[in-house]
């Protein structure tokens, strides 16, 4: 009788074999079982005859067949499972190893002895495998097979039923092969597969059962080679053929032609926005044409490769487009890579010249015989000479099949290999890429990727083809201040690796619409962090397929390894050892990509190209006529019945780290060169179970100095103590030298983080290097263990001051260490840091007010040195300005003038600062009309209110909020000023409420009037210069809190005033937004000098419930709805009107709780396209509004001074205002904070004033309008059309704008 220990010994070289692993079974019952049945193609007699001829039991044939099925579906070459012996109903393990050098007859013979009925050494009764019996079979496997054996007595039906129940208690999947009790030679063999519903569905179970039938049939047909076995069913073949019926078409278009069209249509639009300056589309065209002329004179044309060497710069885009116009193919080089590697790339392409920036000219001179400088004053002047010449940039000299670019990736021989992609392959990917990412001329795409990474090519060219803006950050910001750079550019689209996304916070990027994750697998928590904020696109692909061969829009439930292909190309899964054999759905195989996106191959490497870019297999040629090239990806995947693809692993030793492809053989080659004493070397990507520690490259080196004389058996049974050598002082002294040599030869991402010396190199049972064991042993090493192998070892010294203690905390958080693991003299990178964790460290320090960059971390990696060189700076944006610091000049003079105009003693003047543009405009209107922008709000009070307590509460609110104690004056030197005074807000008791009027200049702008008769009520007279719709509820909430005894925080408005003084220049934004505006304002005034008097009112409410509404703000929906309404009324597609923005998006600390009015009135221009869907226009409106946030406080007066078009845009006569959602009343609120029509009328100065409120699912619109300009019938029609437009926008975001306009027309 066997024991668990005996099983473990028997299966020690085998990893647990768990099956099934499908992708689409969520929500299924995980406990109940179901069965499917198939019949064997051949009679049982044929099976017996074959087994007799081979000298093996029938059970052995069945076991090997099941092993073949498991190998296909799990991807494991070593499979194991349970076998039920019919003679005694015991359970025994079966192990089968499939290797390329073994034929089927050898495998059958090897399985005969352990599975023989005469051998019971490994038998265990089923009861001993239960939970109560001591240990679980699932420790080893979760599938079981049982069937008839020669010479054994057939089990009875009762015994079979009992055994089946026992098996189902132990295993997730049971396969039974049974033969009816009839004449054996003629009987039909049945295969019954019983499975847990939670693990697979019926169609999947049926496919597995049919695969078992196919495996048995292939064995008894006499096939010897496993790579000739076909487990594919006709149903699976038919399904895959349907999925892959249509290929994407080749395109004859040219990328530079598509870009040139935008240069013609929108010459003034920004094409490239860089840290070093911007280029309009006109400048992009002219400067790249200049580069083209220079390159053509130097012999650049089709199939000539031109290396481009730039730091992150706007000029790199000019260089790329210039090479393309010249007809050549470009290669982007990263100057951070070792010169030796850059030279090898230039030598590989026989580079005639290098196009370089001024800064990289010296490095470029060492790479080729000629350097063309692009950028800088001299080079720019040279390119400018070509402006005005005949622009033959669209002359077609490069054909679609010609090379567009080459990307060099890691090569197993130690030399980078160049992947060549043509114009046609890039263009084939373009339509799907633009659609998937929703790129258009409003997109601002952040170019983060290294120039050595092909994603940067797509970021640039796809954006320009769409008419968008390429945003180029600096190298310094890329490593030190990524968050700020993304914010600065108003980024809408961001492509990064999941590793980089991990250190970013979605909440920091209000303008971001889409994040593209690629290069490596995403963790589920990372996806969830992003999918709730922006669209998440996960790209799967290879440089050989123009980056994107499969794309997926992920949702919260997406598997982190699941990808979907919807790219116009075709994907197939084949036997990894034989691409002439298709795999069944759900089985593991190598992914093949077919279609126009497939590149041309490897540069000057015919052998590698022929292995990877193959002619269509025979099965594919049967499907479609004509030959096509198919790319063998080297990725092992499985495709489910819903077409989703699950990545399993790499077929070869190629891995990806932080998005970069690494051929481990290349790294091993250079490690051997750096360590001459090395006899064996293995490099592996180690994934640490601790999520806070990122994956890292490790090198395992066996040298003649450390190697022990171990037997083959010892190497097969190696443990961590036996494998790893002690890190001697001699070894540590060499680490720095070895690392330096590797950095000279390899990019930083390919340099191993740790080099581990070995005593022995462990082997598998087949005497191959046991890479899996090395990965397992290395992953189990603690941080302390790894530190022993670092070049420097320091004695622990505790931090000696507050700054060092702060940096100890930063180190701990960035690296995922405890404080006691970090000393003052510890080295950041020795503790496991890298460039990404340095970015995280810098971000933490900046939040704590330390002026720290990633460059500082690299310059001073020791904790104490970094602390010593880092300054603690005051973040002024987080502090309130000191009084009288926001205007220049003599404080005494300013105070004296303020006191005189306010008729107050100088001692009560608390502060003076400029008025906002909004306040200036409101005060000007009130000087013309005393009632303009003055609200009179009645607040009914309960009878039991304590009036003294209420008065004290109001005094507390006024004390905490200086804006309520603010007066306005005019200074000849400074214009309109705000004066904060130390006084109580006027509290007047009078029954003649209407007789109390506000005096604007030099007097209080807030009055509280207590009326006692006929009922007690509180009246608030307040000028709009000191409140807005957002701050009014805040004020009443504070009054409630103070009445109930709460202490109020001090909230001065001066921080917002300081922000206004430092706003960026808004000229470009508003001029661009208003450019070419010719539509008349709406509604038309009787004559230009007419001042509207809104004396009429209309209301309308409409239900707008929709599941699609959350992607865009209610404000965006209302803006589009009114634009459609106005466009229909005017018969124009280019409309404009005024809108009021909250202003609360400004980057001012605590702005959400300030009572100062931050609203701003701005022109809103919307150009409709009848052929565009609603979603696209919504996206454009919200994007324009988001990009306008930094410029919205400039004021209408200033905007109107920016040119004729801008002045016309400010002449609107319709104002749209989205009211804040009503604040829910608290049970302790002693008055109702809702406001009356007086609020509306205070804001209404245009011909049409629309006040919109969205509560629950209802949009309520109140219109105050001038009845002499707009008739009642017209206003009602406008409101009804507004409601109809809102409903259609919400209901169907894919509806075309033209269809909504038609529906409004049909209502007439």
From Swiss-Prot:
Instruction: Provide the leader sequence positions.
Output: none
Q: Which gene encodes it?
A: lpsB
Function, in words: D-lysergyl-peptide-synthetase subunit 2; part of the gene cluster that mediates the biosynthesis of fungal ergot alkaloid. DmaW catalyzes the first step of ergot alkaloid biosynthesis by condensing dimethylallyl diphosphate (DMAP) and tryptophan to form 4-dimethylallyl-L-tryptophan. The second step is catalyzed by the methyltransferase easF that methylates 4-dimethylallyl-L-tryptophan in the presence of S-adenosyl-L-methionine, resulting in the formation of 4-dimethylallyl-L-abrine.
Q: What is this protein called?
A: D-lysergyl-peptide-synthetase subunit 2
InterPro entries, A to Z:
AA_adenyl_dom (IPR010071), ACP-like_sf (IPR036736), AMP-bd_C_sf (IPR045851), AMP-dep_synth/lig_dom (IPR000873), CAT-like_dom_sf (IPR023213), Condensatn (IPR001242), PKS_PP-bd (IPR020806), PP-bd_ACP (IPR009081)
Query: Which species is listed as the source?
Result: Claviceps purpurea
> Domain comment?
NRP synthetases are composed of discrete domains (adenylation (A), thiolation (T) or peptidyl carrier protein (PCP) and condensation (C) domains) which when grouped together are referred to as a single module. Each module is responsible for the recognition (via the A domain) and incorporation of a single amino acid into the growing peptide product. Thus, an NRP synthetase is generally composed of one or more modules and can terminate in a thioesterase domain (TE) or reductase domain (R) that releases the newly synthesized peptide from the enzyme.
Region of interest (Adenylation (A) domain), ranges: 261-658
Pathway membership of this protein?
Answer: Alkaloid biosynthesis; ergot alkaloid biosynthesis
The protein's matches in CDD domains, at most eight in alphabetical order, are given as: A_NRPS_SidN3_like, FUM14_C_NRPS-like
Chain positions found as O-(pantetheine 4'-phosphoryl)serine: 835
GO CC terms for this protein? Answer: cytoplasm
């Amino acid at each position: 009788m066997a024991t668990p220990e005996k099983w473990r010994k028997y299966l020690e070289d085998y990893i647990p074999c768990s099956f099934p692993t499908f992708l689409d079974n969520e929500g299924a019952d995980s406990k109940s079982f179901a069965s499917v049945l198939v019949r064997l193609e051949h009679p049982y007699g044929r099976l017996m005859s074959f087994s007799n001829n081979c000298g093996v039991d029938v059970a052995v044939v069945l076991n090997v067949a099941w092993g073949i099925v498991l190998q296909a579906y799990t991807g494991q070459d070593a499979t194991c499972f349970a076998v039920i012996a019919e003679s005694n109903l015991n359970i025994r393990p079966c192990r089968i190893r499939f290797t390329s050098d073994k034929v089927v007859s050898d495998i059958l013979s090897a399985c005969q002895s352990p599975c023989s009925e005469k051998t019971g050494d490994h038998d265990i009764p089923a009861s001993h495998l239960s939970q109560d019996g001591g240990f679980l079979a699932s420790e080893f496997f979760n599938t079981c097979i049982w069937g008839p054996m020669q010479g054994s007595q057939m089990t009875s039906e009762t015994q079979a039923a009992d055994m089946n129940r026992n098996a189902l208690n132990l295993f997730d999947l049971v396969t039974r092969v049974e033969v009816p009790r009839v004449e054996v030679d003629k009987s039909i063999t049945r295969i019954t597969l019983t499975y847990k519903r939670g693990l697979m569905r019926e169609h999947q179970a049926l496919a597995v059962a049919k695969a078992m039938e196919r495996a048995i049939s292939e064995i008894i047909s006499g096939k010897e080679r496993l790579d000739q076995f076909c487990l594919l069913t006709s149903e699976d073949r038919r399904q895959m053929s349907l999925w892959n019926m249509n290929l994407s078409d080749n395109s004859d278009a040219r990328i530079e032609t598509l870009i040139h069209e935008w240069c013609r249509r929108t010459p003034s639009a920004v094409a490239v926005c860089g840290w070093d300056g911007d280029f309009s589309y006109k400048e992009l065209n002219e400067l790249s044409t200049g580069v083209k002329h220079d390159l053509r004179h130097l012999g650049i044309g089709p199939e000539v490769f031109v290396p481009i060497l730039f730091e992150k710069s706007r000029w790199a885009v000019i260089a790329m487009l210039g090479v393309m116009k010249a007809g050549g193919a470009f290669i982007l080089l990263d100057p951070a890579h070792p010169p030796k590697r850059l030279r090898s790339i230039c030598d590989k392409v026989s580079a005639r010249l290098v196009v370089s920036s001024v800064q990289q000219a010296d490095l470029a001179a060492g790479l080729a015989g000629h350097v063309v400088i692009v950028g800088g004053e001299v080079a720019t002047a040279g390119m400018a000479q070509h402006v005005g010449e005949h622009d033959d940039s669209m002359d077609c000299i490069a054909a679609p099949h010609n090379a567009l670019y080459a990307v060099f990736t890691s090569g197993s021989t130690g030399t980078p290999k160049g992947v060549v992609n043509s114009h046609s392959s890039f263009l084939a990917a373009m339509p799907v890429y633009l659609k998937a990412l929703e790129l258009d001329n409003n997109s601002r795409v952040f170019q983060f990727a290294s120039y050595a990474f092909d994603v940067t090519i797509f970021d640039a060219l796809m954006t320009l083809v769409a008419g968008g803006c390429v945003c180029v950050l600096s190298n310094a910001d890329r490593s030190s201040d990524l968050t700020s750079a993304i914010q600065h550019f108003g980024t809408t689209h961001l492509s990064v690796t999941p590793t980089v996304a991990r250190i970013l916070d979605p909440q920091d990027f209000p303008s971001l619409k889409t994040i593209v994750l690629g290069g490596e697998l995403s963790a589920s928590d990372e996806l969830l962090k992003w999918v709730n904020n922006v669209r998440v696109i996960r790209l799967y692909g290879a440089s050989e397929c123009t980056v994107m061969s499969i794309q997926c829009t992920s949702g919260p439930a997406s598997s982190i390894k699941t990808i979907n292909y919807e790219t116009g190309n075709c994907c197939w899964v084949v036997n990894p050892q034989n691409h002439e054999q298709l795999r069944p759905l759900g089985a593991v195989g190598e992914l093949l990509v077919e279609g126009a996106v497939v590149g041309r191959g490897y540069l000057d490497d015919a052998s590698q190209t022929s292995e990877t870019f193959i002619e269509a297999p025979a099965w594919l040629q049967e499907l479609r006529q004509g030959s096509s090239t198919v790319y063998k990806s080297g990725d092992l995947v499985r495709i489910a019945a819903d077409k989703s693809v699950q990545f399993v692993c790499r077929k070869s030793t190629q891995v990806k780290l932080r998005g970069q492809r690494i051929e481990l053989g290349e790294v091993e080659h250079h490690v051997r060169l750096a360590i001459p004493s090395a006899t064996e070397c293995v490099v592996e990507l180690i994934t640490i179970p601790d999520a806070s520690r990122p994956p890292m490259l490790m090198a395992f080196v066996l040298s003649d100095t450390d190697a022990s004389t171990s037997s083959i058996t010892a190497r097969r049974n190696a443990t961590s103590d036996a494998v790893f050598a002690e890190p001697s002082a001699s070894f540590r002294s060499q680490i720095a030298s070895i690392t330096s040599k590797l950095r000279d030869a390899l990019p930083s991402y390919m340099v191993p983080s740790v080099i581990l010396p070995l005593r022995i190199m462990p082997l598998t049972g087949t005497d191959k290097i046991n890479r899996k064991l090395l990965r397992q042993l290395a992953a189990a090493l603690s941080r302390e263990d790894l530190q022993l192998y670092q070049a420097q070892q320091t004695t622990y010294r505790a931090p000696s001051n507050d700054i060092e203690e702060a940096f100890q905390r930063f180190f701990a958080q960035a690296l995922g260490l405890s404080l006691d693991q970090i000393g003052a003299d510890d080295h950041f990178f020795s503790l496991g840091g890298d460039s990404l964790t340095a970015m995280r460290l810098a971000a933490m320090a900046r939040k704590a007010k330390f002026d720290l960059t990633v460059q500082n971390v690299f310059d001073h990696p020791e904790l104490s040195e970094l602390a010593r060189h880092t300054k603690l700076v005051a973040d002024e944006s987080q502090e309130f300005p000191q009084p009288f610091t926001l205007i220049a000049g003599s404080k005494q003079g300013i105070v004296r003038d303020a006191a005189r105009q306010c008729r107050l003693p100088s001692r009560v003047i608390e502060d003076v600062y400029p008025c906002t543009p909004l306040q200036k405009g409101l005060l000007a209107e009130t000087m013309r009309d005393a009632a303009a922008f003055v609200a009179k709000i009645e607040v009914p009070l309960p009878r039991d209110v304590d009036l003294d307590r209420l008065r004290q509460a109001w005094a507390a609110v006024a004390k905490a909020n200086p804006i309520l104690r603010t007066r306005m004056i005019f200074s000849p030197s400074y214009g309109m000023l705000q004066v904060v005074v130390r006084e109580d807000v006027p509290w007047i008791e009078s029954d003649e409420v209407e007789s109390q009027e506000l005096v604007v200049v030099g007097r209080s702008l807030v009055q509280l009037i207590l009326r006692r008769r006929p009922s007690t009520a509180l009246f608030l007279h307040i000028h709009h210069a000191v409140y807005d719709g957002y701050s009014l509820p805040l004020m009443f909430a504070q009054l409630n809190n103070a009445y109930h005894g709460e202490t109020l925080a001090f909230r001065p408005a001066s921080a917002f005033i300081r922000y206004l003084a430092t706003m960026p220049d808004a000229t470009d934004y508003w001029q661009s937004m208003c450019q070419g505006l010719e539509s008349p304002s709406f509604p038309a005034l009787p004559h230009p000098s007419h001042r509207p008097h809104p004396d009429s009112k209309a209301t309308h409410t409409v239900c707008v419930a929709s599941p699609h509404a959350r992607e865009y703000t209610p404000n965006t929906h209302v803006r589009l709805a009114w634009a459609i309404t106005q466009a229909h009324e005017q018969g124009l597609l280019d409309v404009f009107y005024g809108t009021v923005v909250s202003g609360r998006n400004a980057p001012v600390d605590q702005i959400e709780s300030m009572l100062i009015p931050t609203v701003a009135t701005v022109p809103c221009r919307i150009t409709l396209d009848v052929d565009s869907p609603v979603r696209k226009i919504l996206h454009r409106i919200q994007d324009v509004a988001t990009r306008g946030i930094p410029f919205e406080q400039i004021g209408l007066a200033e905007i109107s001074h920016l040119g004729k078009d801008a002045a016309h845009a400010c002449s609107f006569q319709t104002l749209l205002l989205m009211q804040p959602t009503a604040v829910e009343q608290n049970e302790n609120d002693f008055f109702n904070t809702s406001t009356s029509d007086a609020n509306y009328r205070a804001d209404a100065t245009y011909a049409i004033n629309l006040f919109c409120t969205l509560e629950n699912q209802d949009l309520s619109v109140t219109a105050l309008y001038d009845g002499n300009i707009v008739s009642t019938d017209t206003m009602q029609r406008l409101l009804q059309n507004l409601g109809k437009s809102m409903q259609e926008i919400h209901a169907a975001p894919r509806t075309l704008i033209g269809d909504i306009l038609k529906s409004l027309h049909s209502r007439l």
